Amino acid sequence: MLQAEKRFVMTRITKITACLICICAVFGTASCGKKASLPDVRNLGQILTVSREEGSGTRTEFDTDLKVTEQNADQVVSSTKDMLETVASTKNAIGYVAYSAIANELDSGITADDKTDKLSLSRQTAEYKMIKVDGVEVSDKTIRSGKYALCRDYYVAYKGKLNSVEQDFLRYIMSAGQKEVDKICVGKKKAATFLSDRSEGTISIEGSSSVAPIMEKLIAGYASYNPKATITLKTTDSSDGLNAAIRGDCDMAMSSRALKDYEKELLAYEVIGLDAIAIVLQKNNPITDLSTKQIRDIYNEKYPKWSDIN
């Protein structure tokens, strides 16, 4: 009798356990499986993909991070400004820009302390909007933590040994200049005290349009420490800047992409700041979040229409 009761109890426990496993499996699949459908986007029609030009560091990092292989974009633009203007004026467009470029569009008097508030205001007033990627909003905090999927570094590169004024400027960038970097993107390290040796000379800098706004602030900040230095800035793109440094046509290059192996052999480089690639849509587009896979598939031409994503 006791053996029969024991078998009965064990059978009941086994059945209950099996039911619980089934329930967990059902709800687990619902919460961890495919993402929620997008809002109704049928009125948006065809997707207009906007890309940067070949040679752009932002494009290189975008393609690399997302494994974009096609990049037969509907429209190609040659600057961050053109990208934002195109997306802002086109309801069905999707594009990508440096997160720091959004900050640069704001009041020129922005400080590191009020950047978050002004970015929040920008999201309400601009004709374009940054959206979440994989459910994570791009911000200084998510860039520092690495939680945002499309983070990247900003570089200064140079050939050979730096002269006195170039060394002084680079020391400024990596110390007190980090406060200026923080006003636009995210500093590589905490700002520190800087004492210039007030070397005389001229420095020519060329390269990335994403890094250029940061460099403008660094040049202005350095002038208060060393008025004897003259620094010229030419905005092109990362590849052009790096090639110019290799040829000796400029003293320093700005790059918003990682250096290629052959470039690393020919140039020395420093990471001066952290940034991210923000995905931008026209402000009236109802979409607020896309996965990295969805973005990749859009640029790999898997989805001709916005409604195809669903």
Identify what each model region corresponds to.
Residues 5-17:
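Bacterial N-terminal signal peptides that target proteins for export
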Residues 16-24:
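Sec-dependent N-terminal signal peptides
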Residues 27-31:
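C-terminal motif of bacterial Sec signal peptides marking the signal peptidase cleavage site
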Residues 32-310:
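Exported/periplasmic ABC-transporter solute-binding proteins
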